[in-house]
């Protein structure tokens, strides 16, 4: 099985991330155009619960398996067998709990009985996601990113196609059944992914002589302990974010219920933020994710050798590279919120939240890089503590603001932005304290200058120039023009020197 280098792996992740983001957005467009605002709101109410249950079912195996597989060729079969048993036990227990708790969650927490059937339908999906994560973890441990990228691509295609089929088939029976259909589509998408991974896995066995096999093997207690020793702490870290996300719609609907909003209106308001604005705002993160994954081994090695200047150089370049997509995306979100919403989702719901959130959300595009640096310098526990504290404060602030009639759903928006500022700022302060890295004030000023000039140019252009084309062509023309202006400004201000970029790529 062919391995990839770190740079090759990062490139594969970047390409796969881009394709998955595009397909994910296509899936979101399909959901919106077929389900409408009400359907998206209903789906977004159960989505955090679904993500929490998936986190619990996978129990940190996506992190534990690559780590253990990369360390040993002899025990790979035992690692896979033990992981499969752990995943199936967890998925079974969680599904049983879900069967008995779905009704109370729907009625008392989400305050919307329509969520009961969609919640129940999550059960089978947990088994598929767990098995898929095990197989993907195996290939990542073998440093082969192709199966993961291909299987994820196939999963997205199957999910989108079946979403359309199931929604068209079930929508006449009611909106609830159509939402259930989207979860069925996710399940069959995961099944398709598993089939691709299994075929690749079985093919790889033919080329191995001493590693993994399909023969039954005896397992001992230490095999499970080795896996759980890594997976449980990893689960704890992910649970913080998942549980915070799980509580989010519960707090929103309950606080708005106090103000007199019906469950349907609350779901629609929450869906506008979480189902329309946030997916668009998160689109550029696939680029920053690939960059953050690429710098981890380099910074980790530099930290072990005490080469702090090397860390500063790599971190500075990563932040500068992330500034390119982050900046132009922010400007476009601020200038064309209604056009983007109408073009993609055929609605203006969420456009005002997109425009308000974009300037502060800009910081999130650097948050992943800072978190990766903390992991590389063995300070992941501090990053987890930051996430925990900021999540708690976000929930407290959200609960307080949502109950103010004049603020209502904007309390969620303010709390999300507060969380981004606090987490990003805190992580930067930790890095500054640990390795002495400081962002140059001159670079910050030049960055804001580039953003400001691009935004003002776009605003003036919109006021004085009307293009005689379709909405799509107009948006593309404005975006290309502003993008070129932005890149020119970045080049003139030397925020991203070409010489340093070429040196970085050669390494």
Model-found features: residue ranges?
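Alpha-helical transmembrane segments of multi-pass membrane proteins
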Residues: 112-134, 346-370
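N-terminal membrane topogenesis motif
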Residues: 1-23, 218-241, 498-507
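Membrane-proximal transmembrane or re-entrant/amphipathic helices at the cytosolic face
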Residues: 460-507
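Membrane-interface junctions at transmembrane-helix termini in multi-pass inner-membrane proteins
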Residues: 128-151, 359-389
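Alpha-helical transmembrane segments of multi-pass membrane transport and lipid-handling proteins
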Residues: 84-108, 312-363
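Helix-terminus/linker motif at the lipid-water interface of multi-pass membrane proteins
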Residues: 22-39, 106-107, 170, 239-284, ...
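Membrane-interface helix-loop junctions in multi-pass transport and translocation proteins
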Residues: 146, 157-195, 200, 381, ...
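Helix-loop junctions and terminal segments of transmembrane helices
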Residues: 58-73, 278-309, 315
């Amino acid at each position: 099985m062919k391995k990839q280098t770190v740079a090759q792996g990062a490139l594969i992740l970047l390409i796969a991330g881009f394709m998955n983001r595009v397909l994910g957005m296509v899936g979101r467009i399909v959901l919106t155009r077929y389900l409408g605002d009400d359907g998206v709101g209903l789906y977004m109410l159960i989505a955090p619960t679904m993500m929490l249950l998936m986190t619990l079912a996978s129990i940190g195996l996506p992190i534990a398996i690559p780590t253990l597989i990369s360390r040993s060729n002899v025990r790979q079969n035992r690692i896979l067998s033990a992981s499969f048993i752990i995943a199936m036990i967890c998925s079974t227990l969680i599904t049983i709990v879900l069967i008995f708790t779905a009704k109370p969650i729907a009625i008392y927490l989400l305050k919307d009985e329509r969520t009961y059937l969609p919640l129940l339908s999550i059960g089978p999906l947990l088994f598929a996601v767990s098995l898929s994560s095990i197989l993907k973890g195996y290939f990542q441990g073998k440093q082969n990113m192709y199966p993961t990228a291909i299987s994820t691509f196939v999963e997205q295609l199957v999910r989108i196609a079946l979403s359309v089929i199931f929604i068209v088939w079930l929508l006449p029976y009611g909106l609830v059944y159509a939402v259930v259909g989207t979860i069925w589509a996710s399940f069959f998408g995961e099944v398709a992914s598993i089939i691709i991974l299994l075929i690749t896995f079985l093919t790889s066995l033919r080329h191995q002589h001493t590693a993994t096999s399909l023969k039954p093997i005896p397992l001992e207690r230490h095999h499970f302990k080795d896996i759980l020793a890594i997976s449980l702490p990893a689960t704890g870290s992910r649970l913080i974010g998942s549980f915070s996300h799980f509580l989010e719609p519960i707090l929103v609907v309950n606080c708005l219920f106090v103000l007199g909003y019906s469950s349907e209106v609350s779901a629609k308001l929450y869906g506008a933020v979480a189902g329309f604005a946030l997916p668009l705002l998160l689109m550029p993160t696939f680029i920053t994710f690939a960059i953050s994954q690429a710098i981890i081994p380099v910074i980790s090695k530099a930290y072990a050798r005490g080469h702090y200047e090397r860390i500063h150089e790599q971190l500075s370049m990563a932040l500068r590279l992330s500034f390119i997509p982050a900046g132009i995306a922010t400007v476009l979100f601020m200038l064309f919120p209604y056009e983007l919403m109408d073009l993609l989702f055929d609605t203006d719901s969420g456009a005002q939240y997109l425009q308000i959130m974009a300037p502060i959300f800009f910081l999130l595009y650097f948050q992943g890089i800072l978190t990766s640096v903390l992991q590389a310098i063995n300070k992941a526990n501090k990053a987890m503590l930051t996430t925990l504290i900021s999540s708690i404060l976000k929930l407290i602030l959200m609960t307080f603001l949502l109950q103010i009639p004049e603020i209502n759903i904007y309390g969620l928006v303010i709390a999300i932005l507060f969380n981004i500022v606090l987490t990003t700022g805190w992580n930067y302060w930790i890095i500054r304290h640990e390795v002495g890295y400081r962002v140059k004030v001159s670079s910050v000023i030049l960055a804001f200058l580039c953003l400001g000039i691009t935004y003002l140019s776009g605003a003036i252009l919109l006021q004085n120039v009307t293009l005689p084309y379709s909405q799509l062509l107009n948006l593309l023309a404005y975006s290309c023009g502003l993008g070129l202006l932005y890149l020119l400004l970045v080049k003139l201000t030397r925020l991203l020197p070409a010489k340093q970029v070429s040196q970085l790529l050669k390494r």
